[in-house]
A protein has these predicted regions:
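Histidine-anchored, small-residue-rich loop motif
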Residues: 1-161
Length: 161
C-alpha cells in the first residue's frame, strides 16, 4: 500500500514513479546483478566479447584491472558511440594519456609513464566509475604478464591549453 501511494504521489508531482531518479537503482539489470550476480574474473579475450557489438550482451570497460558495466550509455560506449574504443578492453593507458588516436594506447600497459601520475589518474577514473549513478563494478580482468617493449610515447598533449 505505502509503495503504491509513494509511486502515485511521485507520479503526481514529478511525472515519474521514482521521484525523477534515473540511476542504477531503477535499472533492472543492476537490481538483478545485486541480487544474483557475482564479481567475475575475465581474461582479456573474454572481456573483448563485451564491446557492444552483440546487443544481447552488456558493454564493459576495464580500467587497470577493474571492469565496469557501462551499458546504460550504449549510445556513448556502443559501436557507433564516441567512446566505443574503450569498450571490451582494459584501456588504462588511454585513460591516463588521453591519447585516443593511437591504437597502441588502448592497453593496460602503463610502462614508460610517470608511475605517480598514472596511478593518480587511474584512481580518479576508478573512483568516477565506482561512484557513478549509472555504472557499476562487475569484476576484474586478469592480464597475462607484459612482454616486449612498452608502447611508444604518445605525442598528444593530455590537456591542451
Amino acid at each position: 500500500g505505502i509503495l503504491l501511494f509513494n509511486a502515485v504521489a511521485s507520479w503526481w508531482f514529478t511525472s515519474s514513479a521514482t521521484w525523477g531518479y534515473t540511476g542504477k537503482w531503477v535499472d533492472g539489470r543492476f537490481i538483478k546483478y545485486q541480487l544474483f550476480g557475482q564479481h567475475t574474473n575475465f581474461t582479456s579475450q573474454e572481456l573483448s566479447l563485451y564491446n557492444g557489438s552483440d546487443p544481447n550482451l552488456p558493454i564493459y570497460i576495464g580500467i587497470y584491472g577493474r571492469v565496469y558495466d557501462v551499458t546504460a550509455s550504449r549510445h556513448i560506449y556502443g559501436p557507433k558511440g564516441p567512446y566505443a574504443f574503450f569498450s571490451g578492453k582494459d584501456a588504462a593507458r588511454a585513460f591516463v594519456t588521453g591519447c585516443f588516436q593511437n591504437q597502441e594506447e588502448f592497453t593496460h600497459d602503463l610502462r614508460g609513464l610517470n608511475p605517480v601520475e598514472a596511478q593518480a589518474d587511474i584512481k580518479g577514473w576508478q573512483d568516477y566509475y565506482d561512484g557513478s549513478h549509472k555504472y557499476w563494478f562487475v569484476g576484474n580482468v586478469i592480464h597475462e604478464p607484459l612482454t616486449g617493449e612498452p608502447p611508444e610515447p604518445c605525442e598528444h598533449r593530455k590537456f591542451p591549453h
